[in-house]
Amino acid sequence: MSTMFADTLLIVFISVCTALLAEGITWVLVYRTDKYKRLKAEVEKQSKKLEKKKETITESAGRQQKKKIERQEEKLKNNNRDLSMVRMKSMFAIGFCFTALMGMFNSIFDGRVVAKLPFTPLSYIQGLSHRNLLGDDTTDCSFIFLYILCTMSIRQNIQKILGLAPSRAATKQAGGFLGPPPPSGKFS
């Protein structure tokens, strides 16, 4: 059990190091560029401006005000898209690094149970959580599963600590895959 605990701590340490490496790469390729800084400031400004306009608008607002808000939303959406495209080049570099490091560490931890899950994972996740492990105990956790979970959560927290995470206003306006859905029927 003590080797399992040591493996778990080592994987968390590896995740912290790879997350710091990823943020370092992103800083070099993206965050320090003038284009990124300009776009980020523009998105922040537009998000706050749009939020204020939406708060002050009433149901009986004229078509003119609604059109202005729609134009501003479109401009914000375009700037968010441009910001995502600027970040894209670092995503390729980070993806390459993570894949190489994951392959290397996966070969080190191959076939070793690194943690014991307090639950039985869903059947479609078991292929990842029990990858390359012998036995039928589905609560055994493989390196790859723990590494992915740690890296995802640690990287987000490192971004928040370093002040590199997108602001709440920009995230709220952008929507996206995990963001809130855009309000429907409000201005149409």
Swiss-Prot record:
| Keyword terms of this UniProt record | Calcium, Calcium channel, Calcium transport, Coiled coil, Endoplasmic reticulum, Golgi apparatus, Ion channel, Ion transport, Membrane, Mitochondrion, Phosphoprotein, Transmembrane, Transmembrane helix, Transport
What topology does it adopt in the membrane?
Answer: Multi-pass membrane protein
Q: Which residues lie on this side of the membrane: Lumenal?
A: 1-4, 107-120, 131-140
Enumerate the catalysed reactions.
Ca(2+)(in) = Ca(2+)(out)
Name positions with the PTM Phosphoserine: 60, 188
| Tree of life domain | Eukaryota
In the record, where are the intramembrane regions found? 121-130
What Pfam families would the database entry show?
EMC3_TMCO1 (PF01956)
Give compartment(s). Answer: Endoplasmic reticulum membrane; Golgi apparatus membrane; Mitochondrion membrane
Q: Which residues lie on this side of the membrane: Cytoplasmic?
A: 33-86, 163-188
The organs and tissues expressing this protein are described as: Widely expressed, with high levels in liver, kidney and heart, intermediate amounts in back fat, longissimus dorsi, brain, lymph, large intestine, small intestine and lung, and low levels in spleen and stomach.
One BP annotation, GO? endoplasmic reticulum calcium ion homeostasis
Summary of the function given for this chain in its UniProt record: Endoplasmic reticulum (ER) calcium-selective channel preventing intracellular Ca2(+) stores from overfilling and maintaining calcium homeostasis in the ER. In response to endoplasmic reticulum (ER) Ca2(+) overloading, assembles into a homotetramer, forming a functional calcium-selective channel facilitating Ca2(+) release. Mediates ER Ca2(+) homeostasis in osteoblasts and plays a key role in bone formation, via the CaMKII-HDAC4-RUNX2 signaling axis. Component of the multi-pass translocon (MPT) complex that mediates insertion of multi-pass membrane proteins into the lipid bilayer of membranes.
Question: Subunit arrangement?
Answer: Homodimer and homotetramer. Homodimer under resting conditions; forms homotetramers following ER calcium overload. Component of the GET- and EMC-like (GEL) complex, composed of RAB5IF/OPTI and TMCO1. The GEL complex is part of the multi-pass translocon (MPT) complex, composed of three subcomplexes, the GEL complex (composed of RAB5IF/OPTI and TMCO1), the BOS complex (composed of NCLN/Nicalin, NOMO1 and TMEM147) and the PAT complex (composed of WDR83OS/Asterix and CCDC47). The MPT complex associates with the SEC61 complex.
Output the PANTHER family linked to this UniProt entry. CALCIUM LOAD-ACTIVATED CALCIUM CHANNEL, PNAS-RELATED
Family statement: Belongs to the TMCO1 family.
Any idea what this protein is called?
Answer: Calcium load-activated calcium channel
Q: Tell me the organism.
A: Sus scrofa
> What does UniProt list as this organism's lineage?
Eukaryota, Metazoa, Chordata, Craniata, Vertebrata
